[in-house]
Amino acid sequence: MKVRNALVSLAAMATLAAAAGCAAPEKESDTTTESGVDAASATSSEDFGGMDELVKAAQDEGELNVIALPPDWANYAEIISTFEDTYDIKVNSDQPDAASQDEINAANDLKGTDRAPDVFDLGQSVALANTDMFAPYKVETFDDIPDEYKDPDGTWVNDYGGYMSIGYDSSVVPDVTSVADLMKPEFKGKVALNGDPTQAGAAFSGVMMAAIANGGSADDIAPGVDFFADLKKAGNFLTVDPDSSTIEQGTTPVVIDWDYLGAAAAANVDTWKTVVPEEAVVAGYYFQAINADAPHPAAARLWQEFLFSDEGQNLWLKGGARPVRGDAMAEAGTIDEELWGALPEVTGEPVIPTDEQTTKAGEYLAANWSKAIR
């Protein structure tokens, strides 16, 4: 799902690509390692005989398939390259700009092949709707992660988070202080939402932010849908999926997205600013999970260990995201204190939708979003 330190401190506020052309090659069905461990059923590094044996098993597989991880999203470029350099395992990154639902679709379409994704990084609504596709696994740092941010068996674990924000090129549009500003004529043809809210976690939270700013709540996302319908009628809403290139080219001068992506945009566009609207502070975490049918099950588990290690968590922090183990690492003295202290404070009461609220909102979006903005 950002308040100066990790979103873990907000826990009390919450209850909580289709295959085309020739068929992909089939993967080997035997996931047993040289030491006799069934990697696909391993639920911890202990099942391999410890981390050293897990590393060996993953290196024997030699590859890891990831999906929907843009290089400039939460520092994934460095995370991937560091994993490759550390373990000498090739990371195959497919569809980097795909949405969460695309990850699930790819896993279903490519099931049984060596091209299927090994791991997922999903928005809340898509993750909770597909838990039967995940393999339970507890990383060595599992106990550091608050109960509110993980499945008890490790079927899914929240990994990093942030706040929904409005990023904008201050050389093109006036300063933004609220969601309502986006309806002004100065924003005509300039406002983009990162993704389709029925498929992408960022877009879902963007509509939730608009709902709260317009009298709705985590229980009532309808005002958010109405806001975007009005934004479209006013000619302000761009039906363009924004990314780093559209921001740099000026195609999408205003983007509703996670605040850590705004920080990444500012690194390339000097005039880019990011604001978290005080009247609609929406926080959210992404969900990390292993594909139960992963073609490289040992590498998938090593990837999880890396992401939730001190090094992996600090790499997300370097990208402006708030790592789920942040508070525990700060207490242990393993957090990057300079980066941790530099996280911007956010004013306002944060809203973290519960699982039930997310499901209800997702159902409403599925029934109403497309007809509202057509």
Pin down the residues of each PLM region.
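Periplasmic-binding protein-like
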Residues: 148, 161-165, 225-230, 269-294, ...
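Extracytoplasmic ligand-binding site segments that recognize negatively charged/polar headgroups
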Residues: 65-80, 92-108, 114-251
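Sec-dependent bacterial lipoprotein signal peptides
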Residues: 1-20
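Mature extracytoplasmic/periplasmic domains
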Residues: 282, 286, 290-350
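Extracellular/periplasmic bilobal clamshell ligand-binding domains
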Residues: 332-374
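A ligand-binding cleft/hinge motif common to bilobed small-molecule-binding domains
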Residues: 125-131, 248, 253-271
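Bacterial lipoprotein signal-peptidase II cleavage site
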Residues: 19-33
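Short, polar/charged alpha-helical segment
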Residues: 49-63, 69-90
